[in-house]
Amino acid sequence: MNITADHWLEGANRQLLSGGSTMNVRRFLVIHFTSGASAQSSINFWKTPAAKGASAHIVIDRDGAVIQCRPFNVTCGHAGVSKWKGFEGLNSCSIGIELANAGNDPKLARRWTKLPLLKAKHKNGGPVEEWEAYPDAQIKACEEVAKALVARYKLDDVVGHEDIAPSRKNDPGPSFPMQKLREACGFKGLP
């Protein structure tokens, strides 16, 4: 997978979202789940006033289809109030990947997919809950995109939203293989 000189991922479908500002330095890759149905439904939501500026650079559907919404040199509203390795407000210095996944909403997961649910406790605390599983095709696509981004932009870390905003976010959650993704990108262990 290659990234073009104008910061687009070759081979990805494009659905341009307006907005954002120039991002001169990219330091981190942040992985999220959409808390929703399909990748397209999330993109459609981001186009509404109710989204309040929420967006991400990449959305990956359960079948592994990759959609890019903004070039990687433009900010997106994916991190919100966040902090990591001395940086605050990570929208200004991170690339966001959203994975179509219901997270810990088992009713939504059962309505949109027949994927298994994992019963687990989140690493940041809370009760044992049911989490939607991530399909192999989606994990593989995420890994390919992440490796290309880390290589192209020499990113400092790959983290979950749950790592940069632990008191308010729980994505991508315990069913996502974060350690495997990080190791594929050249980082050791968990964030």
What kind of feature is each model-predicted range?
Residues 30, 159, 177-180:
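Intrinsically disordered, low-complexity regions enriched for glutamine and histidine
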Residues 171:
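Aromatic-lined carbohydrate-binding surfaces of glycoside hydrolases
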Residues 2, 6, 21, 59, ...:
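Acidic, His- and aromatic-enriched active-site or binding-groove loops in soluble protein domains
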Residues 100, 164, 177:
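Short, electropositive, low-hydrophobicity segments enriched in small/polar residues
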Residues 2-156:
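Active-site-adjacent loop/helix surface patches within enzyme catalytic domains
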